């Protein structure tokens, strides 16, 4: 049967309240969607973790009078009269198949492909990482992920050790291993990210070469030939003293999760320890790379 979709944009903090409001207004289901395609892992029991900028989408029966729905929502203290929203009529489709059909193998650099598990790899001789959207990296189109994957693809990682600082799903560590690294180390503050990385590594046959740690458990004397950190500008600046000691002398550093407008301040935090390359930009995001002095 056809459906009607109503979409609201809000903050992660307000998403639950607006979800309840949509349900009270007659929605049969609610979906939270990141406005900017940033990955979020399964929450811990009793915890709902959402993005800072979240779309709350309510699905309504096709017979619903949406004028009545809007009138109800206008009384909500977070919305008010004339609140911004988008209403769409959805066709009757096989939604699971429709969702899967939206995702295709993606190429990063010259050798590397990221492929959903239900798709055939486009090149058997390429470096293929099998990761599904959602658990792995949202839709996989976020510029910071792309920038990091392209950088790793450009390197000769043969027999190298790579640290993925803030590993999330493990996509960067796994890609490094598939690109020839002898060992990768993933570090993340989120136990759910550690589990996601472990599962993805097993799926790609590299779990025997991937070490995973929460910060409290990581070895004190830990070094790598290549360190990549795709987190955010604030933590990259604050953690610069810790991250800067991870590469060996002459080792490489790659940083992303940084808006282009934040590049200068992040560069300043690392300039004393690294010979930095020109900043590479993609859309509004950027990547900073350099070699350890």
From Swiss-Prot:
One GO BP annotation of this record: methylation
GO CC entries: cytosol
Record InterPro entries: Ribosomal_L11_MeTrfase_PrmA, Ribosomal_PrmA_MeTrfase, SAM-dependent_MTases_sf
Catalyses which reaction(s): L-lysyl-[protein] + 3 S-adenosyl-L-methionine = N(6),N(6),N(6)-trimethyl-L-lysyl-[protein] + 3 S-adenosyl-L-homocysteine + 3 H(+)
Source organism superkingdom: Bacteria
Keyword field: Cytoplasm, Methyltransferase, S-adenosyl-L-methionine, Transferase
Binding site for S-adenosyl-L-methionine: 145, 166, 188, 230
Broadest EC class assigned to this enzyme: transferase
Subcellular location, record wording: Cytoplasm
PANTHER family (UniProt xref): ELECTRON TRANSFER FLAVOPROTEIN BETA SUBUNIT LYSINE METHYLTRANSFERASE
Function description: Methylates ribosomal protein L11.
Annotated family: Belongs to the methyltransferase superfamily. PrmA family.
The protein's name in its UniProt record: Ribosomal protein L11 methyltransferase
Species lineage: Bacteria, Pseudomonadati, Pseudomonadota, Gammaproteobacteria, Enterobacterales
Gene coding for it: prmA
């Amino acid at each position: 049967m056809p459906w009607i979709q109503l979409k609201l944009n809000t903050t992660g903090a307000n998403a639950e309240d607006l979800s309840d409001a949509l349900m009270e207004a007659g929605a049969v289901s609610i979906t939270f969607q990141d406005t900017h395609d940033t990955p979020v892992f399964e929450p811990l029991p009793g915890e709902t973790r959402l993005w800072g900028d979240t779309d709350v989408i309510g699905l309504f029966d096709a017979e619903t009078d949406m004028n009545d729905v809007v009138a109800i929502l206008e009384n909500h203290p977070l919305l008010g009269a004339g609140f911004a929203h988008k209403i769409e009529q959805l066709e009757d489709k096989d939604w699971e198949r429709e969702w899967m059909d939206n995702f295709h193998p993606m190429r990063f650099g010259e050798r590397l492909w990221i492929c959903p598990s239900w798709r055939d790899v486009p090149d058997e001789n390429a470096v293929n990482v099998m990761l599904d959207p959602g658990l792995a990296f949202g839709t996989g189109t976020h510029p910071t992920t792309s920038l990091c994957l392209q950088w790793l693809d450009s390197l000769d990682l043969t027999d190298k050790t790579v640290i993925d600082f803030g590993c999330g799903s493990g996509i960067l560590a796994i890609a490094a291993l598939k690109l020839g690294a002898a060992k990768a180390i993933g570090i993340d503050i989120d136990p759910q990210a550690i589990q996601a990385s472990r599962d993805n590594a097993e799926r790609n046959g590299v779990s025997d070469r991937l070490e995973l740690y929460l910060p409290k458990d990581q070895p004190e004397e830990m070094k790598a030939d290549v360190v990549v950190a795709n987190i955010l500008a604030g933590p990259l600046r604050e953690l610069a003293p810790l991250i800067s000691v991870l590469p060996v002398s002459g080792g490489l550093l790659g940083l992303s999760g940084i808006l282009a407008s934040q590049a200068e301040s992040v560069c300043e935090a690392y300039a004393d320890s690294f010979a930095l390359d020109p900043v590479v930009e993609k859309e509004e995001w950027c990547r900073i790379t350099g070699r350890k002095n």
